[in-house]
From Swiss-Prot:
This is Nucleoside transporter FUN26. Belongs to the SLC29A/ENT transporter (TC 2.A.57) family. Residues 1-63 are annotated as: Disordered. GO terms for cellular component: fungal-type vacuole membrane; plasma membrane. The modification Phosphoserine is found at S45, S58. One of its GO terms (molecular function) is nucleobase transmembrane transporter activity. It comes from Saccharomyces cerevisiae (strain ATCC 204508 / S288c).
Length: 517
């Protein structure tokens, strides 16, 4: 009986772990040894804490969720999540913002390929992303590997895109169209893989890291559209356009490569190995000084590492007897997640369905009074929308929106109210299509400015709802298994909302075509 009790005690994750053999025969000696060790640790805890803070500057001693954004960006772990957020959405926004180049330079505006390009690109991207997210969500492991693998896929896609920009004129339009769609599918799968992995990790780290990913995604929307807006003022020649787009795609490759480097340098999934010594499931006293200041992050990453080490053993054919049971234990049923997250995932779904009409209107509503060409005005609209999206994601961190009184149900209602913007978009499209050729149209500048304001506010509401929804996910869950599984589960609703929104966008293409005629 005594042996059993002592063994149970040893299994607990305590810091000073006695040898199991001594537990049966020398309990008094162990007690004295533990007291001496604790006394020694108290004498040196300050020194060890200082050394640890010098080694791990990425960990803030202050609660991260209470810090302003500029201070959060000094935290290496946070800025890594932020950078990967940029790498997540930059490729998508790069292709979306370059729609005018594809339609004008490759498909020559009037061809059937030019007319269906934007909607087809969104459909191929979102449907493939949805199917791949469903596949990933059922496999709740290898999250860190997914982050790296997805980013590598993006690097390959945009390297190929650079060569395609130079050689596309040698190929027929139909082949160019199908080849671009294939690259879009691979890119969307890479994005899905990275997002699935990083959101699973961010959910466990805390809502502030989820917000870091969201803000990074918004920055990824702003920067490519700013670049394209600047390129619109370059002399309109075939050589300058090709050179500008080539630089545009190369920049995307560079951005994603930086994300890979940062993820490796920050060692989000591996840095615990420098501070732990795990033997037979017991934590040794190497962390006595540092565990106090970094206990939560170490617990999180250590668990992720343990899962990935088990996966590595499986792939090398060295399965433990209980591996099968451990893998099954990791899987959280979707019914459990939906019961806890239904309002949040429905908010995400609704927001993206409504948002996907934005590119159709943005590329079909023309300037009427401002001294800009349509080739300059359309990138400006994309830029304003993305600036609004960024602002919405930043203000989601305000205390009033993180308060428990702003419930998931209120967030869902908020997402439904965005539908009211669609009739306004139709109205502006009708106004600008009837007056775009009339240089003396009264109040046309005001119409342009009002439309720009509408697009900015539409972007604000998109970023606001999405960021709040993802930040509230960890708060609704009870344990780390659920939080990790929620990364893939929420991505299903992201991709499903985008897929349905892209299909609905076809309807608005024909409605807009009817209005313009």
């Amino acid at each position: 009986m005594s042996t059993s009790a002592d063994t149970d005690t040893i299994k607990k994750p305590i810091l000073a772990v006695p040898e199991p053999a001594l537990a049966d025969t020398h309990s008094e000696e162990i007690s004295r040894s533990g007291e001496e060790h604790e006394s020694e640790n108290n004498e040196h805890s300050d020194e060890e804490g200082d050394n640890y803070s010098e080694r791990e500057q990425s960990v803030s001693t202050e609660p991260l969720d209470t810090l302003p954004l500029r201070k959060k960006l000094k935290n290496l772990s946070y800025i890594t999540f932020f950078a990967i957020g940029i790498g997540l959405l930059w490729p998508w926004n790069c292709i979306l913002s370059a729609s005018q180049y594809f339609k004008h330079d490759i498909f020559k505006d009037t061809s059937i390929w030019a007319k269906i390009f934007t909607s087809s690109m969104m459909s191929f991207s979102t449907i493939s992303s949805m199917l791949f997210n469903i596949y990933l969500a059922k496999r709740q492991y290898k999250y860190s590997r997914r982050v790296i693998n997805g980013l590598v896929w993006e690097i390959i896609v945009f390297t190929v895109m650079c060569f395609f920009t130079i050689l596309h004129f040698l190929l027929p339009k139909w082949f160019n169209f199908m080849f671009i769609m294939m690259l879009v599918v691979i890119s969307s799968m890479g994005t899905a893989m990275t997002q699935n992995g990083i959101m699973a990790i961010a959910n466990v780290f805390g809502s502030e890291y989820s917000q870091g990913v969201m803000v990074g995604q918004a920055v990824a929307g702003v920067l490519p559209s700013l670049v394209l807006f600047a390129l619109a003022f370059i002399e309109n020649s075939s050589v300058s356009t090709t050179g500008g787009i080539l630089l545009y795609f190369f920049t995307t490759t560079l951005v994603v490569t930086i994300c890979v480097v940062m993820f490796s340098v920050s060692k989000i999934s591996r840095k615990v190995n420098e501070n732990w010594n795990v033997e037979d499931g017991h934590i040794t006293d190497v962390l006595l000084g540092s565990l106090r200041s970094n206990e939560e992050e170490i617990r999180i990453v250590g668990r992720i590492d343990q899962m990935e080490d088990e996966d590595h053993r499986r792939t090398n054919g060295t399965r433990d007897d209980n591996d099968e049971g451990e893998e099954l234990q990791l899987k959280v049923p979707f019914e459990v997640l939906f019961a806890k997250l239904k309002y949040l995932v429905l908010s995400i779904f609704t927001t993206f369905v409504v948002t996907l009409v934005f590119p159709v209107f943005a590329s079909a509503t023309y300037v009427t009074g401002l001294p800009l060409s349509n080739a300059q005005y359309i990138p400006l609209i994309f830029t304003l929308w993305n600036l609004g999206d960024l602002y919405g994601r930043v203000i989601a961190d305000w205390p009033m929106f993180r308060d428990q009184k702003f419930t998931p149900r209120k967030t869902f209602i908020y997402s439904l109210l965005r539908v009211a913007a669609i009739p306004l978009f139709l109205m502006f499209t009708a106004i600008t299509s009837s007056s775009s050729g009339d240089e003396e149209h009264n109040g046309s500048v005001i119409v342009d400015l009002c439309y720009m304001l509408l697009q900015f506010l539409f972007g604000v509401t998109n970023g606001h709802v999405i960021s709040m929804s993802f930040m509230k996910v960890p708060e609704q869950l009870d344990n780390d298994d659920e939080k990790e599984a929620a990364g893939g589960f929420t991505n299903i609703f992201v991709s499903t909302g985008l897929a349905l929104g892209s299909i609905i966008s076809y309807v608005f293409v024909f409605i807009i075509d009817f209005i313009i005629r």
